[in-house]
Regions:
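Short beta-strand-centered interaction patches in the first periplasmic/extracellular domains
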Residues: 85-99, 132-211
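Short coil/turn segments at secondary-structure boundaries
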Residues: 55, 104-108, 245
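Acidic, small/polar-enriched beta strand-loop surface segments
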Residues: 2-15, 165-322, 334-347
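Short beta-strand and beta-hairpin "edge-sheet" elements
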Residues: 25, 66-93, 167, 299-329
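Assembly/oligomerization scaffold segments
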Residues: 1-102, 190-191, 197-205
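Short, surface-exposed ligand-recognition loops at beta-strand->loop->(often short) alpha-helix junctions
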Residues: 50-56, 110-111, 287-290
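Oligomerization/assembly interface segments of phage tail-like spikes and tubes
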Residues: 36-53, 87-96, 222, 277-286, ...
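Amphipathic, non-transmembrane alpha-helical segments in extracytoplasmic/periplasmic proteins
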Residues: 44-45, 81, 92, 105-129, ...
Length: 347
């Protein structure tokens, strides 16, 4: 879509359900921040305010007003104003914001994860748009937890058992749960009507980043609780990684009624996923594309700047203007194991 036209993002204001109008020319610094570990997208901008200018009446933006960002009839953002400052600064969030605010009591008694997700949405009053098959059994009680925290934990349990990563997002007022894609998106930018679109990864801004062992874990212990007692079900470790980087251990608990084979597979998946160095890169001032959201994969080919291969977008900030620009935080999709694959699993 982005390759078909020159971006023209317009901001519309709604009050009490009624359209006030296009206020694009009255605002500056229109940006959207989208992060993988945040359920909602944040939109921020500043409104021109001059109490002495009769030709620039106060828009009187207030918490609860709705805003939409439209690009050539396509909705890019729809949300509610949460903060309106006296200085004209405004912050709005999409509907995912509500999932981080309301706390509920929820119990899953050995049900399939997809059923737990459906029941969770019904209890929280959030329509479920769609959910992939999640056969992992969930056995847990949450008291006074946000829906987003419960959902994240359920999907983490599923990932540990299946080895697949999952992502959830609020869109069109509904919650959607899907498998995390590994296919790169075709991200194009068209700077002018008389110029052809080009892949945004062809022209990079400033590139920075780091390689880190901060998130590395090379030994897992799986436990099972029974009343006041807990017992060890199994362990998984990489001796070579422990010898090189030191022991970093994490204790996990069974999420349901896993058998021995499932427990073994879960330990193997946990170790394979977490016994890795984290390679992150940050790119500032890259050409903008609406298809670039948190969680998507981009393909880079700039070995000179240490940015080559497939990278997942962990965070993106869109700066809507002339031109449309972005800043990206990326993580390597398939970072190598920390020190070989000589894993030892005991169940």
């Amino acid at each position: 879509m982005a390759r078909e036209y020159v971006d023209d993002h317009r901001l519309f204001l709604y009050h009490g359900g009624s359209l006030v109008g296009d206020i694009t020319d009255r605002v500056s610094g229109l940006t959207a921040r989208d992060e993988r570990n945040a359920l909602s997208v944040e939109l921020s901008f500043s409104v021109l305010k001059n109490r002495t200018d009769a030709l620039a009446p106060d828009l009187k933006l207030a918490p609860g007003d709705k805003v939409r960002v439209i690009n050539h009839a396509l909705e890019v953002f729809s949300g509610v104003i949460v903060t309106a400052g006296l200085d004209g600064s405004v912050t709005a969030y999409d509907q995912g914001w509500y999932l981080n605010k309301s706390q509920i009591i929820f119990q899953a008694s050995g049900v399939a994860a997809e059923d737990a997700v459906a029941r969770l949405c019904a209890k929280a009053g959030i329509p479920l748009g769609g959910c992939v098959s999640l056969p992992t059994r969930i056995q847990k009680i949450w008291t006074g937890s946000e829906l987003s925290a419960i959902l994240s934990e359920i999907l983490e349990i599923c990932t540990a058992e299946t080895g697949e990563e999952y992502v959830y997002r609020v869109a069109s007022g509904k919650l959607w749960v899907n498998r995390q894609t590994r296919e790169p998106v075709a991200a194009y930018h068209r700077p002018a009507d008389n110029l052809s679109p080009f892949p945004i990864t062809w022209a990079l801004g400033e590139v920075s980043g780091s390689d880190s062992m901060e998130e590395l874990c090379n030994r897992f212990v799986l436990t099972e609780s029974n009343g006041d007692e807990a017992k060890v079900i199994g362990t998984a470790e990489n001796p070579d990684s422990i010898a090189r980087y030191g022991l970093v251990q994490r204790v996990e608990s069974l999420g349901g009624d896993e058998n021995t084979a499932q427990a073994r597979q879960r330990l193997k998946n946990l170790l394979a996923k977490n016994d890795r160095l984290t390679r992150t890169r940050e790119v500032s001032q890259i050409w903008g594309c609406d298809e670039v959201r948190s969680g998507v994969v981009l393909s880079f080919g700039s070995g000179t700047y240490g940015l080559s291969g497939l990278y997942r977008v962990d965070a993106v900030t869109h700066s809507y203007g002339k031109p449309h620009l972005m800043s990206l935080t990326l993580s390597e999709l398939d970072s190598p194991r920390a020190a070989g694959t000589g894993d030892v699993v005991n169940v």
